[in-house]
């Protein structure tokens, strides 16, 4: 799918009822402020909408494409009771793609000051990248260790190109690097370096292990 044009996005956003108690937010695993970002889209303030989304979601262009919205945010949309729910996922995708295409920075969160703490993230799949983004927003010095030569984990190795283009993943990763996230590829934690070495020799205070379950199990 090609996604929304600006006109289509505004029209779709205007369908939102801006519920007083938005169930869509409760259905979102990362608690994106959905009515707020949609209202910004309806006003044509796409950069501000991007800022709202990325205040809680580090991977909007990815989530807008592959999150199961029908069971999460859109599944809770009141509009869906008597018709089609608001296309929340497609609106999120539009906002992220618009931001990437136009290179705007006005709506993006500013790079926070360092809080002086170091955290290692093992694995650059969706869990690892999300963790890295959330920590970077809070001022942590984050380094992601990826065993393979390409960053993204299942996002690049398990999802076909037509569903999630690798260029989209690369742009999301580049934005995380803009916030100070460092990425070490071809580094197998447990072989190349151990968790103990990360903490005792390299000064990391915590390690998040998001290595995934991508390897087959031999019966």
Where are these regions (language model features)?
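Conserved Rossmann-like nucleotide-cofactor binding loop
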Residues: 127, 150, 214
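Glycine-rich FAD pyrophosphate-binding loop
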Residues: 140-156
């Amino acid at each position: 799918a090609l996604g929304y044009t600006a006109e289509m996005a505004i029209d779709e956003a205007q369908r939102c009822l801006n519920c007083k108690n938005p169930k869509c937010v409760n259905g979102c695993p990362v608690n994106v402020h959905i009515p707020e970002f949609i209202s910004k889209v309806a006003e044509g303030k796409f950069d501000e909408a991007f800022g709202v989304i990325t205040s809680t979601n580090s991977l909007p262009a990815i989530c807008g494409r592959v999150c199961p919205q029908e069971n999460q945010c859109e599944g809770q949309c009141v509009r869906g009771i008597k018709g089609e729910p608001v296309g929340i996922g497609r609106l999120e995708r539009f906002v992220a793609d618009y931001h990437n295409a136009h290179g705007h920075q006005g709506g993006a969160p500013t790079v926070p000051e360092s809080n002086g703490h170091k955290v290692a993230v093992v694995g650059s799949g969706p869990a690892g990248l999300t963790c890295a983004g959330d920590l970077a927003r809070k001022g942590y010095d984050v380094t992601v260790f990826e065993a393979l030569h390409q960053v993204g984990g299942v996002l690049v190795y398990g999802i076909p190109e037509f569903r999630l283009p690798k260029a989209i993943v690369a742009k999301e990763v580049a934005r995380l690097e803009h916030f100070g996230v460092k990425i070490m590829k071809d580094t197998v934690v447990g072989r190349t370096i151990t968790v103990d070495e990360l903490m005792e020799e390299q000064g990391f205070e915590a390690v998040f292990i998001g290595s995934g379950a991508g390897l087959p199990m031999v019966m």
